[in-house]
């Protein structure tokens, strides 16, 4: 098992490099980089009207020099500005070097989690991520744990009661939850419980109260749960349907197999059959969906929830940075997302062996 883990960890290196290379290459062709933005602000032009004719950050090609022409012609709106000032802008934002050299500098710095400074916030990117990460982790972990805590028992019950009235009624509820996205549940919960039109029970903004630092530990826990209750409820209502149906179908497939009939013929109780024999086999496919559920909630699923409940998390930071073309923050977020995703997938694979010891990764190719 140790050899398998080491192989997987080593394979993460080219995967991360590939993700970084693709992300870096895409950024090179996105118009309206930081140099153009600085120029447009100096010229009093609207930021959205800026464009570039070549590489990222307002750079044509990969080098810092333009063949046969004045340097200011690289950037729309740069006419009238001192070429030396344009060079200083390029140096400030790191675009005075060839693209390939910038990429290897990026790889070197990211290997030590040195993400540089945000272009527009003037703070280290790592500090921004540390500040926003707890919010996204809280939403992702609570949503995933509660969603699976509801969907697994419900899916097992639906499989046992397949075709009954209970199965029919819960199927309607599951389909309803699947059809409506989480952010609509969030808006509904705000209207109902945050003083929109009915009750003022839960807070509308933030993850903690203003006087959080002055509270005792029990009060801090209650305050945190009070703030996070509705965002997590909205995420769970919009996400438990898939894992519920997956659990039900997986159990139905296993229940029909011969070993289940043999266990029943031996006189084992139904509970012993379900949780002593069927559960381990049926849960493999459910566990396989755990990384996707967590990553989805962690990165994309919580973006609109963060907007509705005014939670300053990593999802909103990524969106805002992409809109502002704050490339250090965008690339750092992609790097963190990819790294966490790969680690969670590895943990998911290792969980297979805990659920079913018959699985041996040592004898299989990665």
Label the model's feature ranges:
Residues 12, 132, 136, 172-175, ...:
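Residue-level signal for discrete positions within transmembrane alpha-helices
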Residues 6-12, 16:
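N-terminal signal-anchor/signal peptide hydrophobic helix marking the start
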Residues 16-99, 197-220:
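Hydrophobic alpha-helical transmembrane segments of membrane transport/permease proteins
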Residues 77-80, 84-152:
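An internal, D/E-rich "acidic patch" concept
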Residues 1-3, 96-101, 112-126, 162, ...:
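Short, membrane-interfacial amphipathic segments enriched in basic
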Residues 26-29, 173-206, 234-236, 240:
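Membrane-water interface segments at the C-terminal ends of transmembrane alpha-helices
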Residues 2-3, 134, 142, 146-166, ...:
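Alpha-helical transmembrane segments of integral membrane proteins
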Residues 16, 20, 24-29, 183, ...:
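Membrane-embedded alpha-helical segments of multi-pass transporters/permeases
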């Amino acid at each position: 098992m140790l050899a398998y883990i080491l192989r997987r960890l080593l394979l993460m290196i080219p995967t991360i490099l590939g993700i970084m290379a693709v992300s870096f290459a895409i950024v090179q062709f996105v118009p309206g980089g930081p140099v153009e933005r600085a120029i447009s602000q100096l010229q009093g032009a609207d930021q959205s009207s800026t464009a570039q004719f070549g590489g990222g950050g307002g750079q044509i090609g990969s080098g810092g020099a333009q063949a046969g022409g004045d340097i200011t012609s690289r950037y729309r709106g740069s006419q009238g500005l001192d070429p030396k000032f344009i060079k200083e802008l390029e140096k400030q934002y790191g675009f005075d070097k060839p693209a390939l050299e910038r990429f290897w500098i990026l790889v070197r710095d990211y290997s030590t989690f040195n993400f540089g400074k945000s272009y527009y916030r003037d703070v280290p990117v790592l500090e921004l991520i540390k500040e926003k990460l707890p919010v996204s982790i809280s939403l992702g972990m609570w949503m995933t744990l509660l969603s699976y805590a509801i969907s697994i028992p419900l899916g097992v019950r639906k499989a046992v009661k397949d075709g009954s009235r209970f199965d029919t009624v819960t199927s309607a509820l599951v389909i309803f939850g699947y059809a409506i996205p989480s952010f609509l549940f969030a808006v509904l919960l705000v209207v109902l419980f945050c003083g929109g039109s009915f009750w003022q029970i839960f807070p509308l903004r933030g993850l903690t109260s203003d006087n959080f630092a002055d509270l005792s530990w029990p009060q801090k826990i209650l305050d945190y749960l009070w703030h996070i209750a509705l965002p997590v409820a909205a995420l769970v209502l919009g996400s438990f349907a898939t894992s519920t149906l997956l659990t039900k179908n997986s159990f139905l497939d296993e229940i029909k197999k011969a070993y289940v009939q043999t266990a029943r013929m031996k006189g084992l109780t139904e509970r012993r059959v379900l949780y002593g024999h069927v559960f381990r086999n049926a849960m493999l496919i459910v566990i396989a969906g755990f990384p996707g559920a967590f990553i989805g909630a962690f990165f994309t699923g919580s973006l609109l929830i963060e907007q509705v409940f005014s939670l300053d998390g990593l999802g909103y930071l990524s969106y805002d940075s992409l809109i502002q073309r704050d490339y250090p923050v965008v690339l750092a977020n992609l790097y963190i997302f990819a790294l966490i995703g790969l680690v969670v997938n590895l943990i998911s694979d290792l969980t297979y062996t805990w659920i079913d010891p018959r699985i041996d990764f040592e004898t299989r190719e990665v």
